[in-house]
């Protein structure tokens, strides 16, 4: 019986593949894959044909895996580097975005506010800013209707007087405003003499009203000041008429009085007594604080009213003489009698 044929496992030098060949006496063999003829150098296994074929498959599989390892490693390294590059790029992009986001948001918030305000203004909605804590609340607006004049205190206002006053002689005097003048006009109803004007503010501001019940302005009240001749005027006596004659200016007579003049007095003294005894149209107001004395009973050098009384500040206005001359108070009370100094 013939022996079994043996086989060998050989490797080609050109294609680097493993293959099984039968054992022969010649040393030369040809590659089944690439067809290159080559000599026998090394046997990687020897046995039956089936065993050699299984062994060749295993060797070629391992050779293929080994050859694929560098490629895989290269691919893995390349992929890893690419991933790293991609990661670095992404990280850089994220950082750039993070850096750019604050600046963009900082500007965008103002733009959004402006756009919102513009939209609200377009729709007709307006907002009022709240006042800061430092700013005070605005006070009430100045009204032009309020008076700008200085307020008059009631302490300086004189006591009111009635509109219709009846003097001692029975003649009734009425108040009445006169156009173009700030004072009052007294009209005597029962007398035929003209009216006298009064510029003193004897009545209070509430009583100084005209026919239309209109208050006189404070300027008109201020202009109704007293006259410098008011202290020489005497209050009216009992009479039914008003004398409008002006008192004459008196001068002192340097010559001594004669025996005829001693009884009747000098003409100037008589004129002075007549002028002082004649009543005026001024109404005696309730401010008089002392009784009135006649011309002969008054002392020389003193007036009939005290300087501290309201008559010193303001009183009835007397019509001045056409040619006023300086007079002495002593001349107003000359009796015309001579007195001997030796007695």
Curated annotation (Swiss-Prot):
GO cellular component: nucleoplasm; nucleus
Protein name in UniProt: MRN complex-interacting protein
Region (Disordered): 75-104, 128-178, 193-212, 230-324
Function per UniProt: Plays a role in the cellular response to DNA damage and the maintenance of genome stability through its association with the MRN damage-sensing complex. Promotes chromatin loading and activity of the MRN complex to facilitate subsequent ATM-mediated DNA damage response signaling and DNA repair.
This protein's UniProt keywords: DNA damage, DNA repair, Nucleus, Phosphoprotein
PANTHER family reported for this sequence: MRN COMPLEX-INTERACTING PROTEIN
Tagged with keyword Cytoplasm: no
Subunit structure: Associates with the MRE11-RAD50-NBN (MRN) damage-sensing complex; this association is constitutive. Interacts with MRE11. Interacts with NBN. Interacts with RAD50.
GO molecular function terms attached to this record: chromatin binding
Regions annotated as coiled coil: none
Motif annotated as Nuclear localization signal (NLS), chain positions: 148-151
Compartments, record wording: Nucleus; Nucleus, Nucleoplasm
Residues where Phosphoserine is found: 100, 115
Consequence when changing residue 154 to A: Reduces nuclear localization and increases DNA damage accumulation and does not affect the association with the MRN complex
Residue ranges with Polar residues bias: 87-104, 193-202
Effect of mutating residue 141 to A: Reduces nuclear localization and increases DNA damage accumulation and does not affect the association with the MRN complex
Region (Necessary for the association with the MRN complex): 213-237
InterPro entries membership: MRNIP (IPR032739), MRNIP_N (IPR049472)
PTMs per UniProt: Phosphorylated; phosphorylation is constitutive and occurs in the absence of any DNA-damaging stimulus. Phosphorylation on Ser-115 is necessary for its nuclear retention.
GO biological process: DNA damage response; DNA repair; mitotic G2 DNA damage checkpoint signaling; positive regulation of double-strand break repair via homologous recombination; positive regulation of protein kinase activity; protein localization to chromatin; regulation of double-strand break repair via nonhomologous end joining; response to ionizing radiation
Gene: MRNIP
Sequence ranges of Basic and acidic residues compositional bias: 240-255
Organism of this sequence: Homo sapiens (Human)
Family statement drawn from the similarity comment of this UniProt entry: Belongs to the MRNIP family.
